[in-house]
Swiss-Prot record:
Keywords: Hydrolase, Multifunctional enzyme, Purine biosynthesis, Transferase. Its EC number is 2.1.2.3, 3.5.4.10. CDD domains: IMPCH. Pathway: Purine metabolism; IMP biosynthesis via de novo pathway; 5-formamido-1-(5-phospho-D-ribosyl)imidazole-4-carboxamide from 5-amino-1-(5-phospho-D-ribosyl)imidazole-4-carboxamide (10-formyl THF route): step 1/1; Purine metabolism; IMP biosynthesis via de novo pathway; IMP from 5-formamido-1-(5-phospho-D-ribosyl)imidazole-4-carboxamide: step 1/1. GO terms for biological process: 'de novo' IMP biosynthetic process. This is Bifunctional purine biosynthesis protein PurH. It comes from Streptococcus thermophilus (strain ATCC BAA-491 / LMD-9). Belongs to the PurH family. Residues 1-145 form the MGS-like domain.
Length: 515
């Protein structure tokens, strides 16, 4: 009996060659719509789908393959006489191979001018139905959803006259991943359209971006996946211009650096980062000087770190960075001369290009954190804050210079691991106290790191001071201005201590924990 294949694809890559090889092997080919036209024009003889169903395509192609003659031919178990007899009694011919890929729903909704009607029309119904039917009956039917699998299928058919069960099972699993991902994108789109923020079912889909050598440690297996609907400012969207593949830890650090730089759009800024904590942030009127400040903030910790810049890298800045061992440099662009400088004798230096300012982060954009057996979902911490809403709670008002420095410090401390403290002036970080289990310890670390540079310095805390001992330490160091959220039941004790030492202190009313 002649074997039959059903081919209906939106992605025509390689399909003519695939179909030609099937014909050489003696297969009949059923086809639909544009796929049939493509194959017929290439000289590949095909059978029209309506010749199989006895029913014309209708409703602009919405109904063409949803028919017992198709799904019966796919689902009939070859090992059950009753199934084969039912097919014979109803004049249903068996289908042994299905090659289908789906309407481009993802590509459609990514278009900036997409309409709701366009999105709906690009939801495939018949394609997923055929794929699922064929995949369910993978004991007998081969199903292909990815052109990358054409070669292995042809190789096995040529060698054995059929595919192996292992191949059919693997391809079936791929189909179910594919259709699940397809439906997840549709669900995500419709959920957003109706404004549902707390759906009872959360469906997320990600595409494999990069298999990794290992994870956080060498004994951990790992892979990097990109969101099904890519985010413009994500590390997953960066273009790598030089260097080795990014490691697991590289990606996490780079992500943290990109999050930080988004808050510093108004002036040229450089962020240096290690272990997901900023070790240096510099801001100036030009990117070269901003680099100088970021480097001077902590020339020890920057060694082996990640640097992200929010302006084009020029030759002068590149020369300075070239002299420092860095793992990664991220910037929106590089001059040709800068790129030549950075890559000279630095084949392993990872240089990334990312227009991360193309889109502001939105509070509505969810952030996911995995726990054992569960997933925490929250909005990103990108609330718009205005200094006009801040409250000076001490007797002394801050000077204009202090206000500028406090605004800078408040942006910077948001990305320090809690308990997070940062000491800055108006253009660079001076000391960072991250991740201590008590706040006064973080205060001491930040101050110790800033020693010798505390004249005119200010201090920011990501959360309130639970006790006045923090203010005591700050005053003892000679720092005269503090910014913190406030909100402790002992706020008054901290205010009184600040007044006692002539400090100025601002309450923002917004906490920025980062675990």
């Amino acid at each position: 009996m002649t074997k039959r294949a059903l081919i209906s694809v939106s992605d025509k890559a390689g399909i003519v060659e695939f179909a030609q090889e099937l014909k050489k092997l003696g297969w009949d080919i059923i086809s639909t719509g544009g796929t049939k036209v493509t194959l017929d024009n290439a000289g590949v003889d095909t059978i029209a789908i309506d010749d199989v169903t006895g029913f014309p395509e209708m409703m602009d192609g919405r109904v063409k393959t949803l028919h017992p003659n198709i799904h019966g031919g796919l689902l009939a178990r070859r090992d059950l006489h009753s199934h084969l007899q039912a097919a014979k009694d109803n004049n249903i011919e068996l289908i042994d191979l299905v090659v289908v890929n789906l309407y481009p729903f993802k590509e459609t909704i990514l278009k900036p001018d997409v309409t709701y009607a366009d999105a709906v029309e690009n939801i495939d119904i018949g394609g997923p139905s055929m794929l699922r039917s064929a995949a369910k009956n993978h004991a007998s039917v081969t199903v292909v959803v990815d052109p990358a699998d054409y070669a292995v299928v042809l190789d096995e058919l040529s060698a054995n006259g059929e595919t192996t069960y292992e191949t059919r099972q693997r391809l079936a699993a791929k189909v179910y991943r594919h259709t699940a991902s397809y439906d997840a994108l549709i669900a995500e789109y419709f959920t957003a359209q109706v404004g549902e923020t707390k759906p009872e079912k959360l469906t997320l889909t990600y595409d494999l971006k990069q298999p990794m050598r290992y994870g956080e440690n060498p004994q951990q297996d790992a892979d990097f996946y990109q969101k099904g609907l890519p985010t413009a400012y994500s590390i997953a969207s960066a273009k790598q211009l030089n260097g080795k593949e990014l490691s697991f830890n590289n990606i996490r650090d780079a992500d943290a650096a990109i999050r930080i730089i988004r808050d510093f759009k108004d002036r040229p800024t450089v962020v240096a980062l290690k272990h997901m904590n900023p070790c240096g942030i510099g801001q100036a009127d030009d990117i070269e000087t901003a680099w100088d400040y970021a480097y001077e903030a902590d020339p020890v910790s920057i060694f082996g770190g990640i640097v992200v810049l929010n302006r084009e890298v020029d030759a002068a800045t590149a020369k300075k960075m070239h002299g420092v061992f860095l793992e990664i440099i991220i910037a929106p662009s590089y001059t040709d001369e800068a790129l030549e400088i950075l890559t000279t004798k630095k084949k392993n230096l990872r240089i990334l290009e990312l227009p991360f300012d193309a889109q502001d982060a939105s509070e509505a954009e969810a952030e996911y954190t995995g726990v054992v057996g569960g997933l925490l979902v929250q909005n990103q911490d990108v609330v718009k804050e205005s200094p006009a809403d801040w409250q000076v709670v001490t007797k002394r008002q801050p000077t204009d210079t202090e206000v500028t420095a406090l605004e800078f410090a408040w942006k910077a401390v948001k990305y320090v691991k809690s308990n997070g403290i940062i000491v800055t002036n108006d253009h660079m970080t001076l000391g960072v106290g991250p991740g201590q289990t008590n706040r006064v310890a973080s205060v001491r670390i930040a101050i110790d790191q800033a020693k010798g540079r505390l004249d005119g310095a200010v201090l920011a805390s990501d959360a309130f001071f639970p006790f006045a001992d923090n203010v005591e330490e700050i005053a003892k160091a000679g720092i005269k201005a503090i910014i913190q959220p406030g909100g402790s039941v002992r706020d008054q004790e901290s205010i009184e201590a600040a007044d006692k030492y002539g400090l100025t202190m601002i309450f923002t009313g917004v906490r920025h924990f980062r675990h």
